[in-house]
Every structure is written in structure tokens, then in C-alpha cells.
Amino acid sequence: PHALGGPGFVGDDAAPVPGGDLVAACDAIVPSMVERDPEWAGWCSVLVNLNDLAAMGAAPVGLLDALAAPGAAHAARVLDGLARAARAYGVPVLGGHTQLGVPAALSVTALGRAARPVPGGGGRPGHAVRLTADLGGGWRAGYRGRQWDSTTSRRTDELRAMLGAVAAGRPAAAKDVSMAGIAGTLGMLAEAGGCAAVLDVAAVPRPAAASMGDWLTCFPGFAMLTADQPGASAPPAGPAVSAVCGELTTGRGVSLRWPDGEVTEAVGGPVTGLGTA
């Protein structure tokens, strides 16, 4: 169990390090993406780890990367994307490890600081669900309907403002939207809190270029799902758009409430199988 997070943080986006305010996150990029789109893989390795820290309310300190590549040219393309993202976010790459002559693979560890990390499992029935998302940008070329790219066009101050949203708002629970999409990530947040969730489809902030079906299931670049007492203020989040769009309820899974009042099942049960945090 200790490999999955400490008490109260099981399955969380990042792990508080005992004895201080250090928070660590580690994510790997799908190898096929590292192979066919190395610059984007490098950028995303920074993006997803900083999003993980942000979901805990942690301010980033630095990054470590572990890269494997078939050759030096391929490795350079991955590292170029990684370095560009690190500069864009204003977060240093502290070091890492590179191995050549092997299949492509990439993993990044991010370190941050948070005196009081925000858990993913702090939501309870009756809490309002809020989505804070960057609706700028568009579909990444080659990933239409699957990966939305808003971050590569943002300034450093905009990126850092979005990363600070959870720390500023301090909700009861927070999760950054991952490859599971909005629906799947909300399922993770609800599962960690031992409850279910209902999402009001019409209230979900969404870019005009994305269908609702794609938006609820894609990787949206920057998006945070939070749960808190009804009436809690929207956090300052730079260019991101924020709206209450659902609530946590008793039970399990995620339901979608459509504008005509019909309710359909989006997630039938546990997403991770880790249970309550």
C-alpha cells in the first residue's frame, strides 16, 4: 500500500514526502508517443508532472528526467521539447539520465513544495464539483479528438497562474484531468472520496472546436476538477475558465445530466480500483 501513497493520499497525483513540505510527482509518457512525436512527448512530460503538483497545491521546484532513445538524434528531439516546456513554465531541469541504443521511453519526476497538500480524496457527498480549464488553443496535429493543446501558445505568467489555482482556492479535493478525460478523472476523484458524482453537461466549460463527447474523454492540456462546499469562490486561474458543473453524491461512478433532464451513466464503478484514499 505504501507504494500507492501515504494515508489520505492513496492514488493521488503526487506524493507528500514525510518530514517536510516536499511533494514529488512522477509520470511516464506512452512509448509510442515518444517514438512518433518526440518533441511533443518531451513537452507533455513536463506538462503532466507540473499539473500533478498543481493538483496538490504544490509550487514547482525542479524536474528530473529519465530518457531512453534509439539514437542521439531522437534523444535530442525529446530533450528539445522537454527543455522548451521547462523554459515556458519557468521550472529548471535539475538533472537526469539518458540511455541510447534502446527503445524510446521517457519518465519525468517533478519536485514541489506545499505546506498543506490538497488531497484527491477529500470530496464528500454534497460537495460541488468545479472544472477549471484552459479553453485556448486547439487539437494537437495527429491527435484530433484525443489531445487538446492550449499550453504551447501560453506565456509563462499565464501558465504559472493556472498552476496556482488549487493552491489559491484550497478546495476539499482536487485532481488534474489526465488521459482518462474529464469523466474518468471525476470518477477517480469520487472513488478516492468514497462517493459518486453527477456532471451537468450543459455547465461544463468547453471550447467551441471540441464536441462534448470528445471534450469529456480527451486529455485537455490544463484542466482541474475540484470538490468543495457549495458556494465556494472560483479560484484565480489566469486565462482558464472555471464553473461549477456538478456535485458529489452517495454511491459510486459518474453520471451525466443532460440539458433535457435525462441522466446517463458515464462511469459505472471504480476507475483505479484503489478505493477510498
Q: What are these model-derived regions, one by one?
A:
Residues 139-158:
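Short, compositionally biased
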Residues 37-63, 77-88, 158-166, 182-188:
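Small-aliphatic-rich amphipathic alpha-helix that forms the alpha element of a beta-alpha
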Residues 6-10, 23-25, 92-96, 110, ...:
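General beta-strand structural signal in soluble alpha/beta enzymes
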Residues 238-277:
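Acidic, Ser/Thr/Pro-rich beta/coil linker or hinge segments at domain junctions
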Residues 155-221:
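Active-site-proximal betaalpha loop/short-helix elements
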Residues 1-34, 56, 65, 83-94, ...:
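Extreme N-terminal cap/leader segments of soluble proteins
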Residues 227-233:
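Helix N-cap motif at beta-to-alpha junctions
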Residues 22-23, 29-31, 59-141, 247:
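Glycine-rich anion-binding loops of enzyme active sites
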